[in-house]
């Protein structure tokens, strides 16, 4: 009986002959967390669009934010550059993106249980990425451009807005949040894949 239990325990770690390291385990947790946040962002954005009148949807679709506040953070411009980037670089960019949402995410909270998950989930993800950075650093300076970590909140974040501007701000925040969580999910997935030499990390 003990032998069967031992065999099941080994199989539960996966079919790979390679042991699962602490780094792989941390990456799996981080990827799972950002996937949850990305799905949550997609759901919130979809629910928000569904709540709009047709005229409001058309108006907001015309101003879809091509530029988000976090675009000040230098990141790979395409999938090829992403694949060429080092694990440490991808982790560093992911950390900056998550950190840039610490203040704006408060505006997304409230009103529903899913919305109230955003800030604590971001904090958990940020801590996990920080641990991964420390585990992968090799003496290089992780954040050479400290200004990137001090991004100002979205321009009208603290202002009292009229109904139309408030609607636009919410739309922009949700759209940019969805965009950035997709970026972080991509970067962490590629970085995690690098730990498995046999894996195909093609995007």
Curated annotation (Swiss-Prot):
Principal subcellular localization: secreted
Record-listed Pyrrolidone carboxylic acid modification sites: 18
Localization: Secreted
Residues annotated for Zn(2+) binding in this entry: 36, 185
MF (Gene Ontology): growth hormone activity; growth hormone receptor binding; metal ion binding
Keyword Transport part of the UniProt annotation: no
Keyword Metal-binding listed: yes
Disulphide connectivity of cysteines: 68-176, 193-201
UniProt-listed Pfam families: Hormone_1 (PF00103)
Position of the signal peptide: 1-17
InterPro entries named in the record: 4_helix_cytokine-like_core (IPR009079), Somatotropin (IPR034975), Somatotropin/Prolactin (IPR001400), Somatotropin_CS (IPR018116)
Role description: Growth hormone plays an important role in growth control and is involved in the regulation of several anabolic processes. Implicated as an osmoregulatory substance important for seawater adaptation.
This protein's name: Somatotropin
Naturally occurring in which organism (per UniProt): Pagrus major
